[in-house]
């Protein structure tokens, strides 16, 4: 089910034809927003890095209680990029210096941005989960999504209660908007009011 997504991600290479070997390349899903201030923390000697991002579901400030952080946006120097999908699949974690058998992917940039997952109306979430390819992937979803979750009313109630809309054990809590959120959101609270708890 991932073939189409991986192909599309690798098509990013088409836009890199004129990139210089020392240019910084960043790969993100659309809902992963890198913090502009964190980009400055990337240094060329790192080769590769991942941005640790605050993880929110359904609303701009509804944060996952079990998994509040997400390793999202990837960055690397162009000359080290094999493919965009390869970069996306790199597993970043702190490894001891003696693990010479593994690429040392220790470069985790803190306060690296925001992952606004499923920032959609109940109607659009219903459409997504009825059609998303991952729901047929036995490694992502162990079972088919129960039909009891696939209706607008159920989705709306789960969102209001801070529960996962398809019945997984994850829960979400409102976080007060503060300087840890994007400046644009803070300055435009009124505009985004329907997306803020």
Predicted regions located by residue number:
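C-terminal accessory extensions appended to soluble enzyme cores
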Residues: 108-197
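Acidic-enriched, low-complexity/disordered segments with a strong bias for Aspartate over Glutamate
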Residues: 23, 29-31, 101, 136-137, ...
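Active-site-proximal specificity loops/subdomain of glycosyltransferases
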Residues: 1-27, 36, 181, 189
């Amino acid at each position: 089910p991932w073939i189409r997504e991986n192909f599309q991600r690798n098509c990013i290479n088409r836009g890199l034809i004129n990139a210089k070997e020392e240019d910084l390349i960043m790969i993100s899903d659309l809902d992963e927003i890198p913090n502009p201030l964190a980009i400055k923390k990337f240094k060329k000697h790192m080769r590769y890095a991942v941005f640790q991002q605050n993880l929110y579901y359904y609303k701009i400030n509804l944060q996952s209680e079990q998994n509040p952080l997400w390793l999202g946006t990837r960055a690397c120097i162009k000359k080290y990029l094999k493919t965009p999908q390869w970069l996306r699949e790199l597993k970043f974690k702190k490894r001891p210096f003696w693990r010479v058998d593994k690429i040392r992917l220790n470069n985790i940039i803190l306060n690296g941005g925001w992952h606004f997952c499923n920032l959609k109306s109940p109607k659009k979430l219903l459409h997504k989960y009825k059609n998303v390819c991952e729901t047929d992937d036995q490694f992502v979803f162990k079972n088919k999504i129960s039909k009891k979750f696939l209706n607008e009313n159920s989705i709306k109630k789960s969102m209001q209660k801070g529960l996962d809309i398809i019945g997984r054990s994850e829960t979400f809590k409102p976080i007060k908007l503060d300087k840890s959120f994007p400046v644009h959101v803070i300055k435009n609270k009124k505009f985004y009011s329907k997306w803020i708890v």
